[in-house]
Each structure stands twice: as structure tokens, then as C-alpha cells.
């Protein structure tokens, strides 16, 4: 089960779509060797990325392409 929960994550991100895209991109960065910005018990990059987003350690920028 994902911690923080989807509902908790949606309080810091404006939509489910943005949440999925931001989490996936950050997880890919972690897989590729990016420094992890939170203490995490999980060795799963998606869980770590979600925790980083929830704690505000990682942000995303909405572009014009996102509005299509």
C-alpha cells in the first residue's frame, strides 16, 4: 500500500494526472541515480518519489502542454 495515500497526495498536487506524471518522472530520476531527498524505509522508487512529493521536497511545473 502506498504511503502517503492517494488522498493525502492529492492535497499537495492539483490532479490525479499531475500526481501520476510527477511521481513517474521522479521515480525514473531515482532509478537513474538521483539523490533521494527524504528518509524512506522503502526501497521502491515510486514510494520514495510519492513521499518526496508529499513532503514538498520535489515540485513540478505545469506547462502549456499539460493543459491540453
From Swiss-Prot:
One of its GO terms (cellular component) is DNA-directed RNA polymerase complex. Keywords: DNA-directed RNA polymerase, Nucleotidyltransferase, Transcription, Transferase. Coiled coil: none annotated. InterPro entries: DNA-dir_RNA_pol_omega, Pol_omega/Rpo6/RPB6, RPB6/omega-like_sf. It catalyses: RNA(n) + a ribonucleoside 5'-triphosphate = RNA(n+1) + diphosphate. One of its GO terms (molecular function) is DNA binding. PANTHER family: DNA-DIRECTED RNA POLYMERASE SUBUNIT OMEGA (PTHR34476:SF1). The RNAP catalytic core consists of 2 alpha, 1 beta, 1 beta' and 1 omega subunit. When a sigma factor is associated with the core the holoenzyme is formed, which can initiate transcription. Belongs to the RNA polymerase subunit omega family. Promotes RNA polymerase assembly. Latches the N- and C-terminal regions of the beta' subunit thereby facilitating its interaction with the beta and alpha subunits. This is DNA-directed RNA polymerase subunit omega. It comes from Alkaliphilus metalliredigens (strain QYMF).
